[in-house]
From Swiss-Prot:
Its EC number is 2.8.2.8, 3.-.-.-, 2.8.2.-. Its main location: Golgi. The gene is Ndst3. This is Bifunctional heparan sulfate N-deacetylase/N-sulfotransferase 3. Pfam families: HSNSD-CE, HSNSD_N, Sulfotransfer_1. Residues 590-873 are annotated as: Heparan sulfate N-sulfotransferase 3. It comes from Mus musculus. Pathway: Glycan metabolism; heparan sulfate biosynthesis; Glycan metabolism; heparin biosynthesis. It is found in: Golgi apparatus membrane. One of its GO terms (cellular component) is Golgi membrane. It is a single-pass type II membrane protein. The presence of 4 different heparan sulfate N-deacetylase/N-sulfotransferase enzymes in mammals, as well as differences in their enzyme activity suggest that some initiate heparan sulfate modification/sulfation reactions, whereas other later on fill in or extend already modified heparan sulfate sequences. Belongs to the sulfotransferase 1 family. NDST subfamily. Strongly expressed strongly in brain. Expressed at high level at embryonic day 11 compared to other stages of development. Weakly expressed in adult heart, kidney, muscle, endothelial cells and testis but not in other tissues. The keyword Transferase applies.
Length: 873
């Protein structure tokens, strides 16, 4: 019995030991599992509630975390889709302003509360490289169908999302984001921000010291995170945490921007807890665009800065530089060279005013000239006169020769090739005499202005090249001739400091790869605000950004500018009378009244010459004088004539006797299919009416071929019409050129759509060419009504049909007629059937598109188009 009991006790003891071992194992496993979970939570917790001093010691795991796919350049267009609350919402406008400033392409849509998203793809290519929501709640609360479509697009094309949280009520808020593993607390005031040095977003932005002080606004949102996919970017302390549930600490730092690494659902996002009023948010916004677009939308870190000091030797007594000021200028130049590679002040002089100050200021003049080799120099005008006030070139040349003589006498270099006009007069709007005189006296190749295309908004300033002189955009820095004393700065000294420390001046440098700053002699005397401004600006840029500041001489700077922006080489002329500042620096001898009120744009061989003849019969309608070089047509907007400038263009038009009732116009039939003409015309004459004539494109093509034969075009004489229109891609160059001139103008819908990009439909009249040929009086009544010209002219009594010519002519006194010249209305064989069939097929799709366009515009279909569409059926 005892023998049987012993094994039984052994067995019990073994079971107890096994059970105990299992329990201990479970407890240990649970402990470590819990510890692991807790550690993971602590990483996220530290990410949302940290001591800024400990940021350097955030676990390196945050840097090594796996990230989702970034946009593939070949699969998406480099365009940003921006969902705004409304067309006029403040934050939406700020977002657009930033995108425009850094010259990124964007498309805006009103964020849909309900309804469909805009098309996100074009065939298999994504239309957008990045999506921005002014209000991220519009994305969060989107209906499931559209949300799934958008998320699928983002995942498939590697597209990220930037969103801003906007608090909707004034009371404190705290809630969980639907479908996301984090919560927010809103409507808070915050202070003392710092940057996470480990954030992969940082590119322009440099993680720096703690920025103490209150941040603008009391509507901040902070993020509380409980998932490792979120990484904080900027932290701040909360100033007003009372009455929040759950409560948050006053002493801890909370994330105001978070980066969703995409581990949760495969989409990377950057979420902002406030708008762009805070300067660090703007910097991170730029970096977020760069990172989420896979650096397709990114800024170089190189910044080129040139500081011009205008008006050297100019100024009233008491506003000029003395010897100590000049020494301070030299010392500061050396100091700035430690932060801005090759930094050199660029001095613009007007020699007439040398030694016109106090005794101390005259000594300052001499000290400047004694240090002439330490600076770069450029000429102003001798007497600081505005060039547009000189109406002849010889007077300008005399002034420039005096200034050059002064320079040679005092050892000032004269070979920099750069000049600036007082008040930017004559640079834009262009005063041709200035450009010619500059080249003859100084061999000027570079200048700058703040006026092209307009002074404001500054983000639209651009460069251009005219008369082989490169014109660069110039920037203001808040210093003008009257800003001499720090305490008397307009709006108070804090306004200047605010501009330097994350304000307008700071972002001028951040957003522009090249900045030429305008300052004045008076800014370097007295309180030396010029030195104060640029020393503090360089310090701030170096502290908070990774930008590489450097200076280049003007010639190198200009070449660098047009390497970066080759599309800006061609100018885009505008009406000087539409901008008061432009009127003030434009010659009083010139008038905008000589610009046309309407344009006849073609296309060729549709009856534009006949229309022109009929138009000038009207007593209130005046045409341009004929051009001797381009078959009477001016051809300004579509050819190199455009680079001659608007003075050249306006010289073709008479001065109207009555600006209100007289209508100037020009007819250039090549405008119709020109790539450049619509944009150029809209810029110079945006209110001009546009008239085009359409005939069957097959007939137009054949007429052009016969026209070229009559002018002995070798290709037209050598090849039949069918050979021309059916030529393949490997045909001889001259044959392909003739083919293009025959066929391309007949793509009517394409060309009209291009004009409609720049002109509203009510400014466009489309004439049926067949009606013009058969019932011109009726058509001319329609034209008069469209133009709004008076008095009404009775074309029924003024036109008569000439059976010999085969078209309508002007009826003169005593029964005589005035018809078009011999080159018009030629008789030639009818088109062969093969060519007719080929062209009918070739233009089929184009004609269908034209019918859709005319239907959209509410215009009737021409009779020839109705006939062609019947063939489609």
């Amino acid at each position: 019995m005892s023998f049987i009991m012993k094994p039984h006790r052994h067995f019990q003891r073994t079971l107890i030991l096994l059970a105990t071992f299992c329990m201990v194992s479970i407890i240990i496993s649970a402990y470590y599992l819990y510890s692991g979970y807790k550690q993971e939570s602590e990483v996220s917790g530290r990410a949302s509630e940290v001591d800024c001093g400990d940021l350097q010691h955030i676990p390196s795991r945050l840097m090594e975390v796996r990230r989702t796919m970034i946009s593939d350049a070949s699969r998406t267009d480099p365009t940003v889709l921006v969902f705004v609350e409304s067309q006029y919402s403040s934050l939406g406008q700020d977002i657009i302003m930033m995108l425009e400033s850094i010259r990124f392409h964007y498309h805006t849509e009103i964020a849909p509360g309900k309804g469909d998203l805009p098309a996100l793809t074009d065939n298999v290519k994504g239309k957008y490289v990045l999506i921005i929501y002014e209000n991220i709640l519009k994305y969060i609360n989107m209906d499931s169908w559209n949300r799934s479509l958008l998320d699928k697009y983002c995942i498939e094309y590697g597209v990220g999302i930037i969103g801003f949280h906007k608090t909707s009520e004034k009371n404190l808020q705290s809630f969980q984001f639907r479908g996301f593993p984090f919560s927010i607390s809103g409507n808070l005031a915050v202070k003392d921000c710092c940057i996470n040095p480990h954030s992969p977003l940082l590119r322009v932005t440099k993680s720096s010291k703690l920025d103490r002080g209150s941040l603008p606004g009391t509507d901040w949102t902070v993020f509380q995170i409980n998932h490792s996919t979120y990484q904080p970017v900027i932290f701040a302390k909360v100033k007003t945490p009372e009455n929040l549930s759950p409560p948050i600490s006053k002493h801890a730092f909370y994330a105001t921007i978070i980066h969703d690494l995409g581990l949760h659902d495969g989409i990377q996002r950057v979420l902002f807890g406030n708008n762009l009023n805070f300067w660090l948010h703007k910097l991170i916004f730029i970096d977020a665009i760069s990172f989420l677009s896979g650096k397709r939308l990114t800024l170089s870190l190189d910044r080129y800065i040139l500081v011009d000091i205008d008006d050297i030797f100019v100024g009233k007594e008491g506003t000029r530089m003395n010897t100590n000021d000049v020494k301070a200028l030299l010392d500061t130049q050396n100091l700035l060279r430690t932060q801005i590679t090759n930094f050199t002040f660029n001095l613009g002089f007007s020699g007439k005013f040398y030694h016109t100050g106090t005794e101390e200021e005259d000594e300052g003049d001499d000290c400047l000239l004694g240090s002439v080799d330490e600076f770069w120099w450029f000429p102003h005008m001798w007497s600081h006169m505005q060039p547009h006030l000189f109406h002849n070139e010889s007077s300008l040349i005399e002034q420039m020769i005096l200034n050059k003589k002064f320079a040679l006498e005092h050892g000032i270099p004269t070979d920099m090739g750069y000049a600036v006009s007082p008040h930017h007069s004559g640079v834009y709007p262009v005063h041709v005499q200035l450009y010619e005189a500059w080249k003859k006296v100084w061999n000027i190749k570079i200048t700058s202005t703040e006026e092209y295309p307009h002074l404001k908004p500054a983000r639209y300033r651009r460069g251009f090249i005219h008369k082989n002189i490169m014109v660069l955009p110039r920037q203001t820095c808040g210093l003008f001739t009257h800003t001499i004393f720090y305490k008397e700065y307009p709006g108070g000294p804090r306004e200047l400091d605010k501009s330097i420390h994350g304000g307008e001046l700071f972002f001028t440098v951040v957003l522009n790869p090249i900045s030429i700053f305008m300052t004045h002699l008076s800014n370097y005397g007295n309180d030396r605000l010029g030195l104060y401004t640029f020393v503090n600006l360089a310090n701030f840029v170096q502290t908070w950004t990774n930008l590489r500041l450097q200076t280049l001489p003007p010639a190198q700077l200009a070449h660098k500018y047009f390497e970066l922006f080759p599309d800006q080489k061609d100018p885009l002329w505008q009406n000087p009378c539409d901008d008061k500042r432009h009127r003030d620096i434009w010659s009083k001898e010139k008038t905008c009244d000589r610009l046309p009120k309407f344009l006849v744009i073609g296309p060729q061989k549709t009856g534009t010459t006949a229309l022109c003849l009929f138009l000038i019969m009207h007593p209130s309608i005046l045409s341009n004088s004929p051009s001797p070089k381009s078959f009477e047509e001016v051809q300004f907007f579509n050819r190199n004539n455009y680079h001659r400038g608007i003075d050249w263009y306006m010289d073709f038009f008479p001065v109207p006797s009555n600006v209100t009732t007289d209508f100037l116009f020009e007819k250039s039939a090549n405008y119709f299919h020109s790539e450049d003409a619509p944009k150029r015309a809209a810029s110079l004459v945006p209110k001009a009416k546009i008239i085009t004539i359409l005939i069957d494109p097959s007939d137009r093509a054949y007429s052009w071929y016969q026209h070229q034969r009559s002018h002995e075009d070798p290709a037209a004489l050598k090849f039949s019409f069918y050979e021309v229109i059916s030529a393949g891609p490997n045909a001889p160059w001259e044959l392909r050129t003739l083919q293009k001139r025959c066929l391309v103008p007949g793509w009517y819908a394409n060309h009209i759509e291009r004009w409609l990009v720049y002109f509203p439909p009510f400014q466009l009249l489309i004439i049926d060419g067949q009606h013009l040929r058969t019932t011109p009086a009726t058509v001319m009544d329609e034209v008069q009504k469209f133009l709004g010209v008076s008095p009404h002219y009775n074309y029924s009594e003024a036109l008569t049909f000439d059976s010999h010519k085969g078209f309508w002519c002007q009826l003169l006194e005593e029964g005589k007629t005035k018809c078009l010249g011999k080159s018009k209305g030629r008789k030639y064989p009818p088109m062969d059937s093969d060519s007719r069939a080929f062209l009918s097929s070739y233009y089929r799709d184009h004609n269908v598109e034209l019918s859709k366009l005319l239907h959209r515009l509410g215009q009737p279909l021409p009779s020839w188009l109705r006939q062609e569409l019947q063939k489609v059926r």
